[in-house]
Amino acid sequence: GIVDAASNGVGSDAVILIWDAKARQVVSINAEGTAPKLATIEWYQKNLDGKLPESDTLLSGTVPGVVDAWYTLLDRWGTMTFAQVLQPAIEMAEGGFPIGERMAGAIKGSRKLKKYPSSVKVYFPGGEAPKAGDIFKNPDLGRTLRKLVEAEKEQTGKGRHEALKAARDRFYKGDIAREMA
């Protein structure tokens, strides 16, 4: 989600296939987000006259599933911690990396990103889209990933499962969830 944000990121979904060598079977993880709890037919009828919201608004979004997928992968098959797995991404988000042509082109061509001040701040620093090779930073994303690591570290004494769960729960039930809502 750092170097190729259009492919996958902390606010997105994931569909993952795993070969579980021990069980000798393919396992599928479907981390496609669910609709928010209050997104009911009645709510849309009352608030939007029964119309569906535009596809690029929060009203059409789902709860991001990717952090739960990371948790599931690490908890069931992993040996590393969130801290170990996320450290390279945190370093790139905060320190920057040379942006590739594909991501630079996607940013430049995106009208949706330009509609939201928070996206403009990240993707159009100085008011301009980055060019391929420019150093691109996303410190806000780095801070979000650090929060997952902090939550995990706070629960390390309770065991691996509880520590991983604490990171996931901070995203879905803690301050990160409240900031997104």
For the regions a language model picked out, list residue spans one by one:
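Noncatalytic scaffold domains of N-terminal-nucleophile
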Residues: 1-181
